[in-house]
Design a protein with these regions (language model features):
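Active-site rim helix/loop that mediates acceptor-substrate recognition in acyltransferases
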Residues: 69-88
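A residue-level signal for beta-strand positions that form part of recognition/binding surfaces
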Residues: 41, 115, 167
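Active-site/acyl-donor-binding loops of N-acyltransferases
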Residues: 2-21, 25-28, 150-179
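Acyl-donor binding region in acyl/amide transferases
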Residues: 111-162
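Short, solvent-exposed loop/turn elements at beta->coil junctions and helix N-caps
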Residues: 78-80, 106, 155
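Short amphipathic alpha-helix that is part of the acyltransferase structural core
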Residues: 14-74
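Conserved donor-binding loop and adjoining core beta-sheet/short helix segment
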Residues: 84-126
């Protein structure tokens, strides 16, 4: 079954239109209100699996930025098969053809709710593309998700002001005891 069939039809009022080679098979989410806020021409693109390969090297640079702050659960190369088979989704922020940011999401079907989890998000010029997050929220709603979740550093709460810290993830490294 195709990835889009699993995700359902888009019912959001957000305009969508395919453009260019990369975007030809991806859904493109553009907000005309936010588009001109910083004088930029940002496009937030949900990249189809078949369009990932041409931009993968740029995406890896962004993933590596986020992974540097993780507990080592995944390396950039570990995302690739999940993105290619549709288990995770790749979003990119493009401004006049430049790839400024990448985000990986995953649909989590909990027993009592469906959630869109942000696995990784990083890039440059965040103050210009972060304002497009409501477009991704709209997509999440259109596929039946009732909330978003993000495992990130505390600093994200300053940026995502309408989010709350629901709980903390506490870890302990046991590798020293393995030898």
């Amino acid at each position: 079954m195709s990835r889009r069939a699993n995700q359902g039809e888009e019912t959001s009022s957000t305009p969508t239109e395919p453009t260019g080679i990369l975007e030809a098979r991806a859904r493109e989410f553009i907000s005309s209100k936010n588009q001109h806020l910083h004088g930029s021409n940002y496009k937030i693109i949900l990249v189809a699996p078949e369009d990932i390969e041409p931009i993968w090297d740029q995406v890896v640079l962004h993933l590596d930025m986020a992974i540097a702050h993780s507990e080592g659960e995944m390396g950039a190369e570990d995302f690739y098969p999940y993105l290619m088979d549709g288990q995770m989704q790749l979003w990119v922020a493009r401004n006049d053809g430049e790839l400024d940011a990448s985000m990986v999401t995953q649909i989590i079907p909990y027993p009592r709710k469906r959630v869109l989890r942000i696995i990784s998000i990083a890039g440059d010029k965040m103050e210009q593309w972060i304002e497009f997050l409501p477009l991704i929220e709209g997509w999440a709603l259109s596929i039946g998700c009732t909330s978003l979740e993000c495992w990130g550093r505390k600093g994200w709460l300053k940026i995502l002001q309408d989010w709350k810290c629901s709980y903390h993830i506490i870890t302990k490294d046991l590798t020293a005891r393995m030898h």
